[in-house]
Amino acid sequence: ECATVPVLVEFWRPGCGHCQALMKELAQLQGELGERVLILTMNVDENFQIPAELEVSSLPALALYRGGSFERFIGGLGKKDEIRSQLLIG
């Protein structure tokens, strides 16, 4: 289904400390932005097809989707203000 808002997907793996830290930042960002963005997480051990197609090589990775299509990976991992600025919505 095609979302009408930007969608961020964090690719993560259990036991990855940086992944857990990013999840906390993303939860705060979701709270601040509400319905202006949809933030999802994907465990690469359970769902490996999409990360493989995107050639995810390190974790955590944060992918931006618009209109249902992959747009790009975004930086600022762990810094919600940097992530927000790359979304151009807040």
Give the location of each predicted region.
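Hydrophobic beta-strand anchors of alpha/beta hydrolase catalytic cores
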Residues: 8-9, 39, 62
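Structural microenvironment flanking redox-active thiols in thiol-disulfide oxidoreductases
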Residues: 44-52
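The canonical Cys-X-X-Cys-His
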Residues: 16-19, 62
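Chalcogenol-based redox active-site neighborhoods
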Residues: 28, 53-54
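Short active-site neighborhood of thiol/selenol oxidoreductases, capturing the structured segment around
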Residues: 2-14
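Typically the conserved alpha-helix immediately C-terminal to a functionally engaged Cys/Sec
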Residues: 18-33
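Non-catalytic, surface beta->alpha helical segment in thiol-disulfide oxidoreductase systems
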Residues: 58, 63-90
